[in-house]
Amino acid sequence: MHHYPIFLKLHGCRCLVVGGGEAAARRAGDLLRAGARVELIAPVLAAPCEQLLDTSPGELHHRAEPFAAGMEEGAALVVGASGDEATDRTVYEACRARGIPVNVAGRPSLSTYITPVQVDRSPLQLAVSSGGAAPVLARQIASRLETLLPAAYGRLARLAGRMREQVRVALPDKDWRLRFWEQIFDGAAAESVLAGREAEGEAELLRLLEQEQARPAPQGEVFLVGAGPGDPDLLTFRALRLMQRADVVLYDRLAAPALLDLVRKEAERIPVGKRRGRHTLPQERINERLVELARAGKRVLRLKGGDPFLFGRGGEEIEGLIEQDIPFQVVPGISAAQGAASYAGIPLTHRDYAQTCRLLTGHRRAGHPQMKAHAPYRQDETLIIYMGLVNLEAVCEQLCECGLPPEHPAAVVAQATTPQQRVVLGNLRTLAERVRAERVESPALVVVGPTVQLHPRLGWYRGEAEDRDAAASIDPCWTGGMRD
C-alpha cells in the first residue's frame, strides 16, 4: 500500500485551485461541496469556472493573476490544474516547502496526495483509487459501486448518526454496540429506511434498542474457520462473513498474511501457529484461550489453514468448547491437499492412474515417521503426506521398505496456491536430495503416486518462484510412462 486512505475535514478551510479550465472547475466544485472556501488562481477563467463562480458567491473567489510562490501560505490544501508544466511544478515545490498537501491533476509524481473517485451517499462516502496507476479502472469500479448502492443508503447513514449517542449511552460496551448495529443494518429497520419508510425504520430501531437493554450482555461465540490453502480467493463466503465480524482472531502460521488482511481491522490478532515443534502456544493453552475469550463476550475467530478437521486439531478444540457450553460454528475450508493438487496439476485420482487417495501425516514418533504403520501401499494410489518435509528422506525410505519401487513418482508442492508456489518433481529415490538442493521450505505437502507424472502436462499454475522447466526433473527411470 503506497497511499494511506484518509478523509479530510475541510469545512471553512481555505483551499487553492491553480488553473482556470475544466479540470480546475471540477476540482473546485468538489472542494465547495466539502464546505471549503476556494480560491481560483488563474489570469483568465474558461466558461466552466465562470459558471461555477456565478453559482457559488461568497465561497469561491478568483485571483486574476498567475500563481507565485507565497500564495499558498495559510492554505489547508492546494490543487494544481493549470495544465502548464512550469506552473504545476512551481505549485508543487512551493507547497512541499511549506508541508501543504498538494495534488497536480494527472501528475502523481508532483502530488503528495491522490484524489480518489468518489461514490457519494452523504454522509456515507466511498472512495476508489489506483494510486494514479490506472485512473480509468478506478472510475469503472466506482461506476459499478454506484449501481450497487441505492441513494437511500445516505438516509440510513443519517439515521444511524442521529441515534449514535443514544445507542452509546444505552449499550456502554463497544462490542455489544457493534453487534447491535450489525443487527440493525442486516434487518428490518434498514430495509424500511431503504424502502423510503424512514419513520418506520426509526421506530424499529428504538424497539430493538429497548429490547437489547432488557437482556443480559450477549454471550461470546467461537468461529472455527478453515482458511483454505493460501489464495484468499479460495475462501468461502461464510468464512469471509465471519472474519469480518470477529472481535479477536487466533491464527495459525499456515494462514497466509493476505488472509489476515480480510479480518475486521479492529479485531485483536493473536498468533498461535506451530512450526517444527516450536509452538507459540501449546494446544492445551489454545483450547483454554478460546474458552476464556468467549466467556468474556468476544466473538472469537479461530483461523486455521486448509480445513480445520483435516490434521488441524479442530476436533480437539471444539471438544473443549462443548465441555464448557460455549456456542461455536465450524466453517470447512478447501484442504491443503485439494489446493496443492489442483494448482500443481496433479490429480488425486485419475481413471488411468490412481483409483484411490490416502491422506497421511509424516510426523515423527519415537524419532521416526510412522509410514510403516499404514502399509501396505499400492502403486495405483495417490498418497498426500502432511508435515512430511522435515522427515522427507526417512518418509521416502520407509515407503520403499514397504514395497514401493525407488522409481515411484513423488513431488513436493510448497506454498500451494500462492504466487510463491513451487513444485519439485522426482521419485522416492531422488526427491529428498532435490528438495534440499532447491531449499524448499514449509508449508509443503508431499505427493506420491503415478499422477505426479501428469504435472508437466496439467500444471496450469506457475508461481513466481517455480522452475518453469520442472518437467525435466521427472526421473526417466520411472517405468509407468504417460498415456496419451
From Swiss-Prot:
Sorted UniProt keywords: Cobalamin biosynthesis, Lyase, Methyltransferase, Multifunctional enzyme, NAD, Oxidoreductase, Phosphoprotein, Porphyrin biosynthesis, S-adenosyl-L-methionine, Transferase
Listed name of the protein: Siroheme synthase 1
Binding sites annotated in the UniProt record for S-adenosyl-L-methionine: 229, 305-307, 310, 335-336, 387, 416
Superkingdom of the source species: Bacteria
Post-translational modification Phosphoserine, affected residues: 130
Residue span of region Uroporphyrinogen-III C-methyltransferase: 220-484
UniProt key word Lyase: yes
Catalysis performed (reactions): uroporphyrinogen III + 2 S-adenosyl-L-methionine = precorrin-2 + 2 S-adenosyl-L-homocysteine + H(+); precorrin-2 + NAD(+) = sirohydrochlorin + NADH + 2 H(+); siroheme + 2 H(+) = sirohydrochlorin + Fe(2+)
A Pfam family hit: TP_methylase
Enzyme Commission number(s) of this protein: 2.1.1.107, 1.3.1.76, 4.99.1.4
Entry's Gene Ontology BP terms: cobalamin biosynthetic process; methylation; siroheme biosynthetic process
CDD domains per UniProt: SUMT
InterPro entries tied to this protein: 4pyrrol_Mease, 4pyrrol_Methylase_sf, 4pyrrole_Mease_sub1, 4pyrrole_Mease_sub2, CobA/CysG_C, NAD(P)-bd_dom_sf, Siro_Cobalamin_biosynth, Sirohaem_synt_dimer_dom_sf
Chain residues that bind NAD(+): 22-23, 43-44
Keyword Methyltransferase belongs to the record: yes
PROSITE patterns in the cross-refs: SUMT_2
Function: Then it catalyzes the NAD-dependent ring dehydrogenation of precorrin-2 to yield sirohydrochlorin. Finally, it catalyzes the ferrochelation of sirohydrochlorin to yield siroheme.
Source organism of the structure: Halorhodospira halophila (strain DSM 244 / SL1)
